Regions:
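Alpha-helix boundary/capping detector
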Residues: 66, 98, 127, 191, ...
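Generic structural "secondary-structure junction" signal
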Residues: 21-24, 62, 118, 158, ...
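A general structural signal for well-ordered alpha-helical segments in protein cores
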Residues: 33, 65, 69, 94, ...
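Active-site beta->alpha loop and helix N-cap motifs at the rims of alpha/beta catalytic domains
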Residues: 2-153
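Catalytic alpha/beta core domains of metabolic enzymes, predominantly
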Residues: 135-141, 148-253, 257-261
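C-terminal alpha-helical cap/extension of soluble enzyme domains
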Residues: 2-3, 10, 15-20, 43-45, ...
Length: 286
């Protein structure tokens, strides 16, 4: 059965790559993380992505992530606004976690390419994504490819995207482009139909929206969520102040990037969030 992705089911706009809270023994602090996700949605962002780079996703076990998903349901977190990082060097782990997310009602999986062995061919990367899709065999699955070459050292080529879209047009839903090259984002917006492009930084939020992209998935949205929301609302309503709102948001991003410095976004943003909330528990990183 050839089912197309319905426009109304996609998560578009301002999405935050959520931080993950940990307890003193480094175990996952499920309640604090979910509460933070609810706070983000209260800032009127459009979606929350758990267990990405900023969420220290690769430091968590599949068991921990599955338990977290179970708690999202128990705590009535809106799953239609949820995306889960499920990528792994292990195809079996990626399939197990994506399957659990799907059966729980979360359709969008953010999938990193296998990243430990460098310089894989497009053929090898195609085989990885293809294997996940075929093993899951679920028409509801929406894979958002994660392009972050500075960290993974595995870039996602346009040829690979084209081939995946040709063979899995109803499953390869989009890409989070954290490469920092806005021309690459705009090129994908132009060249790939029915393919949602998310800027990996709110700096490129408006240009991507104007090119027909889906929006942004941003780490600093943990702090700038409200202003990200304002930009998207202004864009949708054709507010003439949208450029000024974007400029303000870009300035915030630059300040936060500088403030986080060499410690990186995860620990740096946690320090800022801890200070803002007067909550030392947010200082804990894995």
């Amino acid at each position: 059965m050839n089912l197309s992705l319905e426009e109304g089911t996609k998560i578009k706009g301002a999405l935050t790559a959520s931080l993950t809270a940990f307890k003193k023994d480094l175990s996952l602090d499920i309640i604090r993380t979910i509460d933070h996700g609810k706070w983000l949605l209260g800032q009127e962002i459009d979606g929350v992505v758990f267990f990405g780079t900023t969420g220290e996703g690769n430091s968590l076990t599949v068991k921990e992530k599955k338990l977290f998903i179970d708690n999202l349901i128990e705590k009535n977190f809106p799953l239609e606004k949820t995306m889960i990082g499920t990528g792994s060097c292990s195809i079996f782990d990626a399939v197990e976690l994506s399957d659990h997310a799907l059966k729980s009602g979360i359709k969008d999986s953010l999938v990193l390419p296998p990243f430990y062995y460098k310089n894989p061919s497009d053929e090898g990367l195609y085989a990885y994504f293809s294997e996940i899709i075929q093993r899951l065999g679920n028409k509801d699955l929406r894979i958002q490819i994660y392009h972050f070459p500075a960290v993974s050292q595995i870039p996602i080529s346009h040829n690979l995207i084209e081939r995946l879209l040709k063979n899995y047009p109803n499953t390869i839903a989009g890409i989070k482009d954290s490469g920092g090259d806005v021309s690459n984002m705009l090129s994908m917006c132009k060249n790939f139909d029915n393919f949602d492009v998310y800027a990996g930084s709110e700096t490129f939020f408006l240009p991507v929206l104007e090119a027909g992209g889906a929006g942004t998935i941003t780490a600093t949205g943990n702090i700038t969520a409200k202003n990200c929301s304002l930009v998207y609302k202004a864009f949708r309503s054709k507010n003439p102040n949208v450029k000024a709102l974007q400029d303000n948001l870009t300035g915030q991003r630059e300040m936060l990037q500088k403030a986080c410095g060499s410690v990186g976004f995860s620990c740096g943003l946690k320090e800022i969030l801890s200070s803002l909330n007067n909550d030392d528990a947010w200082r804990i990183c894995r």
